């Protein structure tokens, strides 16, 4: 139970001016709600899932160290895209690609699809990366 309680305090954003913190849980739930509000009815649930997954990589210990002012670069956006791919690729390949693009591109824009061993910034190449520690706790 302690691990779950600790995850509730993981930081998504910190206001540089006043130090106010937004947890990953708060941020993801707010983003999911906004994604649903801006969606057509048929895609509300898919967009909710995209909102929930988009920053799941911020649960990495390395990202939390960054939020505590450690000067390190941490890839977080690709983690949610990899999860969407794993869950949706077999039953809904086209849907999986759309979700991956939305999640992976939420900071840097939507990358080219690319081919295996293609450009380093292509979606295909990014999805094959090993990401940080992916551990929590």
Regions found by a protein language model. Name each.
Residues 2-18, 24-137:
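Accessory nucleic-acid engagement/destabilization modules that flank
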């Amino acid at each position: 139970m302690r691990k779950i309680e600790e995850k509730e305090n993981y930081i998504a954003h910190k206001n540089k001016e006043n130090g106010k913190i937004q947890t990953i849980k708060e941020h993801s739930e707010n983003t999911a709600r906004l994604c649903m509000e801006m969606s057509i009815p048929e895609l509300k649930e898919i967009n909710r899932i995209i909102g929930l997954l988009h920053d799941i990589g911020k649960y990495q210990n390395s990202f939390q160290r960054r939020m505590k002012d450690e000067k390190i670069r941490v890839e977080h956006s690709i983690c949610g895209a990899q999860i969407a791919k794993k869950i949706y690729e077999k039953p809904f390949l086209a849907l999986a690609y759309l979700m991956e693009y939305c999640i992976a591109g939420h900071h840097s824009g939507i990358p080219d699809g690319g081919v295996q061993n293609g450009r380093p910034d292509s979606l295909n190449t990014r999805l094959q990366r090993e990401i940080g520690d992916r551990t929590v706790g």
